[in-house]
Swiss-Prot record:
The keyword Cell membrane does not apply. The gene is cyp519A1. InterPro entries: Cyt_P450, Cyt_P450_E_grp-I, Cyt_P450_sf. It comes from the Eukaryota. GO terms for molecular function: heme binding; iron ion binding; monooxygenase activity; oxidoreductase activity, acting on paired donors, with incorporation or reduction of molecular oxygen. This is Probable cytochrome P450 519A1. Belongs to the cytochrome P450 family. Its cofactor is heme. Heme binds at residue 476.
Amino acid sequence: MESIINLIFYIIIFLILIDFLKKNISFRKNEPPRGGVAFPIFGDLPKLGENPHRYLTNLAMKKGGIYSVWLGDEKVFILTDPEAVRDAWVKQFRNFSDHPKTKSVRIFSGNFNDMAFAEYSQWKINSKWVSSAFTKTKLKTIGDLIEKESNYFIEHLKAYSNSGQPIFPKPYISKFGINVISGMMFSQVISKDESVDKGAMEKLTVPIQAVFKRLGADNLDDFISILQPVFYFQNEKFKRQVQEIYDYLEGIYNQHDTNLDTENPKDLMDLLIISTEGKERDMIIHIGMDCLLAGSDSTSATCEWFCLFMINNPDVQKKAYQELINALKDEDNKKFIPISKKDNCPYMLSIFKEVLRLRPVGVLGIPRVALEETTIMGYTIPKGSQIFQNVYGMSHLFVSDPYKFKPERWIEYKKQKDLLKEKEMQQLQEGADVVIDNKNNIKNNNSSNKPNSKTNSIFDDLDKVSIPYSVGNRKCPGASLSELALFSLCSNILLNFELKSIDGKPIDDTEVYGLTIHTKVHPISLTLRP
């Protein structure tokens, strides 16, 4: 018996040693640098900490724009160079068009039967239906819905402001985000009088938050196959949470199917049912889940960050408020700014861009898989490798004063771009050759692999280094909708209230990590403007 135990012990030690060597020794040529010594079994997972994107960004400063880490069984390549991301996501899109098939994603997506995580072949079909439905949806109708929900939101805040009580804004912002998406998608909204703590809000927000936390976490059973049995009960709980959202949307689907008027579709779900001739029930429900979760949560998270940065930067808040006042100088209603005034508020728009640069809600995006062996910026990427885009790292390592909240940088950037276009047009008219710099950004003139080197041709090229909605064919399809919702909600908050912390001190701006990053829970003080 003792000899058997000893044999098992030595076999385990041998397997651990083999795994350690596998993770730390490579004979493949031209592979990117490794992130450091990886532990057996767990790889680099224990090093990631509470905010993996910050650890990976710090690592990029040492290892460069492309490097590899081990997340359990998976060798993962981290792209923190914007040109590397464009090479993979745009130029080599077909090879990087699929996402990893993790257990968590399989559960959420109904075996990859949605938009966000579907395989390329299914994604092409689904995206065609969704794009067609979006095209047939009137932009004015969506704008009216957003403005209506913004009005309701402001009414709730006024009640708190009049009472003198501080407010925890997160549930109200979440309600706004859910109503915009569900109103557009299903023609159903949570009543303005319904509590944010009970009823439909409770039924939706609790499982939505749980699902986002799970999908964004470094789940051990998604990366270490031998640990999957240990997480059986956790996975069963996750299935129930996903099922709660599915059941809610299934009820809505059944109502739409029963009352469908093919001549007068009233929302996106009607249009999808008509386009698919009612044959893709499960797919439509899962696309609805994608929209409800991603659309509502990302917009809500960005609004939370907007409020925090306005409180922590009162001079910016004051300047933005004055711009809103000026935009309404010829309007009768001075207490609500419509979406039509968006282009009259360039400083507000620069604030949103700066918020998304500092705190892109999807800090690591959704990973991709290399379908075939390829090269990115001269480095070999083996077949089957997972690839992460470090959105957070790019918008910090390629920007001057990266940790400073500075909306003015976007105003100046636009001026420089416009001036450059004028010069290029002038050169073309004069018949001169226009030289375009396609310099490799991983290796700078000094052969350094530091991604934040100011010799890089894209350093401070903000549109290229700040990509909160990603790039390529599988970038966020709801970016335009999100921008409209953010402008309407955030501008009207600022127009009606002065935002402050309850103690007059700056609010902790450390993020809470997940598939989208949120602020920590904190109350704020609202002062109704005259």
